[in-house]
């Protein structure tokens, strides 16, 4: 599921969100790879990945994958008011 959200008060800056909650790691990582490819090709500055809180297993898999994906400048957990440890914010190079 892709959801468009605006970041801050600047309407020109937008983040796009991929919701991976409830998916198995292999399925989630396949979707994540395709999603990141499309986001990079479209010139996005960054995206949000929703992996949920739960046990943290999916978050760990997503973070391990992001460490190896080319084109990513950084990633970090979202501030608590934006999803906290259930959301990872990715910034592209």
Regions from the language model: what does each represent?
Residues 1-93:
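Long, charged, low-complexity intrinsically disordered regions
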């Amino acid at each position: 599921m892709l959801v468009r959200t605006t970041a801050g008060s600047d309407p020109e800056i937008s983040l796009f969100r991929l919701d991976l909650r409830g998916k198995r790691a292999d399925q989630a990582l396949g979707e994540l790879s395709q999603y990141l490819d499309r986001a990079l090709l479209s010139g996005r500055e960054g995206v949000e990945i929703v992996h949920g809180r739960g046990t943290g297993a999916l978050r760990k898999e997503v973070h391990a994958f992001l460490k190896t994906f080319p084109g990513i400048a950084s990633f970090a957990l979202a501030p608590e008011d934006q999803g906290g440890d259930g959301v990872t914010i990715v910034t592209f190079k």
